[in-house]
Structure formats: structure tokens, C-alpha cells
């Protein structure tokens, strides 16, 4: 069975756990409608992605 050779310092333990924290999701503003949406995702209200119509808007 594998056993650690040295004790893990609090600094190293904290550096390892730093990736476990919850991060606030990023949002970008749609230049056409001004609505917020996730980057690299389709804007669900307008159905646009990178200037192209991908989905039909919900209002139609």
C-alpha cells in the first residue's frame, strides 16, 4: 500500500484545494439586445450565436 513519504504542508494542501472552490459564472452582454448570456453559449432569448441565427426565439 502506498504511504506518503513526507507530511503535506498546509500551503501545499491549500494550493491543491484552491481548485475546489465554487466560482461565479461569467456573463457577457449581447451587443444586439443588451441581454446577458454565458460566453460561448447561444443567447436563448434571441437565438443568436456569434452573429448567426441558430434557434428560433421563444417569442415566435
Curated annotation (Swiss-Prot):
Signal peptide segment: none
Keywords: Ribonucleoprotein, Ribosomal protein
GO molecular function: structural constituent of ribosome
Statement: the UniProt record of this protein carries the keyword Ribosomal protein: yes
Compositionally biased tracts (Basic residues): 1-16
Keyword Ribosomal protein (UniProt): yes
Region (Disordered): 1-60
Any one GO CC term of the record: large ribosomal subunit
Basic and acidic residues compositional bias, start-end: 34-44
Any single GO BP term: translation
Pfam families for this protein: Ribosomal_L32p
NCBIfam families given in the database record: rpmF_bact
Protein family membership: Belongs to the bacterial ribosomal protein bL32 family.
Protein name: Large ribosomal subunit protein bL32
Species assigned in the record: Parvibaculum lavamentivorans (strain DS-1 / DSM 13023 / NCIMB 13966)
Lineage, broadest ranks: Bacteria, Pseudomonadati, Pseudomonadota, Alphaproteobacteria, Hyphomicrobiales
Gene: rpmF
Amino acid at each position: 500500500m502506498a504511504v506518503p513519504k513526507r507530511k503535506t504542508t498546509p500551503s501545499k494542501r491549500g494550493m491543491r484545494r484552491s481548485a475546489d472552490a465554487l466560482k461565479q459564472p461569467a456573463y457577457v452582454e449581447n451587443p444586439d439586445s443588451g441581454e446577458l448570456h454565458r460566453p460561448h453559449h447561444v443567447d436563448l432569448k434571441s437565438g443568436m450565436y456569434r452573429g448567426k441565427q441558430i434557434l428560433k426565439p421563444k417569442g415566435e
